[in-house]
Amino acid sequence: MLNVHEAPNGFRWRIVPERNDSCVLEEGMVQSDEPGVYLEGEYGIRHENETVVRKGEKNEYGQFMYLETITFVPIDLDGVDPDVLTQYERKWLNEYHQAVYDKVSPYLNDEEKAWLKHATRAI
């Protein structure tokens, strides 16, 4: 059985030697991206997407890689305060939601499309 947290690759805010997940990312590796916030003793919220490592720019500093999203699920806008987003963050969210709608809606019936259209509305 596969798990999104299998070695050898992983991102953490600190190194955990026993996890053995500090490796060089290689093209084709799948990596979960799980931004979140946790309020101690209260609750936590996390949004998770799966990404695949792709080759990006190569220059005098070496080969750069980037993460391409491969799962497309709306971010719940009920949990987003647009007033605290920067222009860049708002643009990113709107573009991400447009990609979600464009990629997923062809597989949905009219009722499901209407739900997805609302869930991915621009802010």
Specify the residue positions occupied by each region the protein language model found.
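Charged, cofactor-coupling segments
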Residues: L2-I123
